[in-house]
Amino acid sequence: MDTVTESKMAIEIAKAGGIGVIHRNLSINDQILEIKKVQKKGLVVGAAVGTNDTELSRAEKIIKCKVDLIVVDTAHGHTKRVANIIKFIKKKKSNKTTLCAGNIATAEAAKFLCKLGVDIVKVGIGPGSICTTRLVAGIGVPQLSALLDVKKGLSKNVKMISDGGIKFSGDIVKALAAGADAVMVGSMIAGTNESPGKII
């Protein structure tokens, strides 16, 4: 989320034992600058890329920055475009960089991403507080159902992040109980001093 994680938030998340993902709604140069601010503190950091043709350049520059995590971030992660950018990143990245892709909501999509060689899948079609997928596309899957289905299609060593639908702390517990290895939050930490969003 572009109003949640830039360097200031990523630094605090890393200090707390997590990893912040610098959003892709910045220019490539600004995103690199935010990544370097976190790295300068000696902390882990991730960065998001999209799937259109200009994102190949973004991905290449992010790989050169030696980020700890690259997230192929799209509303529907079971597509040819997602496959193409994953293949591109896999050829260029080092073994030290973890590759995550999503978002997905089915076992079939999990198998698709696992076959492409991702380390982590990101689960969630429409549950986020600012997500418009359900309104615009008319599709969405309840988060718990999505997690349980995706888990069935995962390869043994591939991890799963639950992305979206966290309104209460208990939602984190439910996601973990459904098999998620980690949980991605947005609105829960938006509007804090560390977030880049403007306070109105």
PLM region spans:
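Alpha/beta enzyme core
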Residues: V4-D163, K167-I200
